Amino acid sequence: MRLIIPRRGDNHCLNTNQSINMDSILDASAGLESLIRSNSIVLSNSFEECIVLYNNYTFK
């Protein structure tokens, strides 16, 4: 899993060029499951499917 850092002006799917590897920070599947359970993320209906975090970072 990569943490996608937003670089464009839109609020939904963000530029995937700037990213860091999250594997050394958290277990990807467990971390994402935890975020979903704690309602920290919101699913975005956009031209491209993505998950937008409350702090405007994006997991893809």
Curated annotation (Swiss-Prot):
Protein name as it appears in the record: Putative uncharacterized protein DDB_G0284851
